[in-house]
Amino acid sequence: LEDFIFIILIYNNFIKKYIPVLPNNFKPFKSNKQNLIRVGPKRDGGYIIDKRIIKKSKTIITCGLNDDWEFEKNYLQINPECNVIAYDHTVNKKFWKMRFKKDFLALIMLKKLTFNKILDVFKYIDYKFFFKDKNIHFSKKIVQKKNKSHEVSIKEILNKKQNIILKIDIEGDEYKILGAVNNECHKINLLIVEFHNISKNIGKIKKFLSNSKFKIIHLHANNYGGIDKFNNPNVIEVTLINSKKFFVNKKKSTKKYPILGLDYKNLKRREDIRLKFND
């Protein structure tokens, strides 16, 4: 019996040490299994959505683009009537020149040998083909309050818009605009946010959730970010649905995260991050 108790204690210590424990209000609400689908690649850049929003959502607004629009591209294959409006002040001519130079050098030095990596060298061509006609990229910085011509606020972005999918990945600046997002919640069907530096900003996320009509329906730890000294993932990908527009079960999910067959590693060569919640 003593040996058994000792093993249990060792196991519990292992769990506490290696599996991040997030606050209970981060735990997703229960969703019907058939409603959750993955859009985008089975790697970094893919996200989970509720398929109930597809026919009712006509525009994806992407805040933070970098060089990845696979989610948007895949979504348009599912719903061709949708359009994409993206904002990212860092994606400009200088960005593409530096990226092409880096990728081309990697190619001639035989560091890019897979088909997909070779295609990446010509990413700019894909960018020009995708962002034309109904799909637009604005090289503007997303801010809480606009002061300069190259800046844009959430209120301005969502002006005269309805039934939006809003996707935010702006490397830590998301916390500055959460209040504005809540103020415009009646225009948004689905919200996808990458939260960065979780331990530092956990209070801000809790406040946002407590004051919001958006309810978490899915959560995944981005293994690119790893785990911090407080045993929290540094980056989490969160999908929230507007509970004023779509039914949300009041019960919390009992699923284990990541969800097999739905979630995939952002970085393939690194273990995915399992999550627990304070019940």
Predicted features along the sequence, with ranges:
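A short acidic, often aromatic-flanked loop/helix-cap motif at beta-alpha or helix-coil junctions
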Residues: 143-149, 223-227
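N-terminal amphipathic/basic-hydrophobic helices that include classical n-h-c signal peptides
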Residues: 1-12
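Class I SAM-dependent methyltransferase Rossmann-like catalytic core
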Residues: 10-54
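Acidic/glycine-enriched edge-of-secondary-structure segments
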Residues: 30-32, 138, 162-168
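Short, well-ordered alpha-helical scaffold segments within catalytic/effector domains
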Residues: 45-47, 69, 151, 175-178
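Core dinuclear metal-dependent hydrolase active-site scaffold
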Residues: 146-158
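SAM cofactor-binding core of SAM-dependent methyltransferases
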Residues: 39-145
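Conserved acidic-Pro-Pro-aromatic motif
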Residues: 59-61, 71-86, 97-98, 155-279
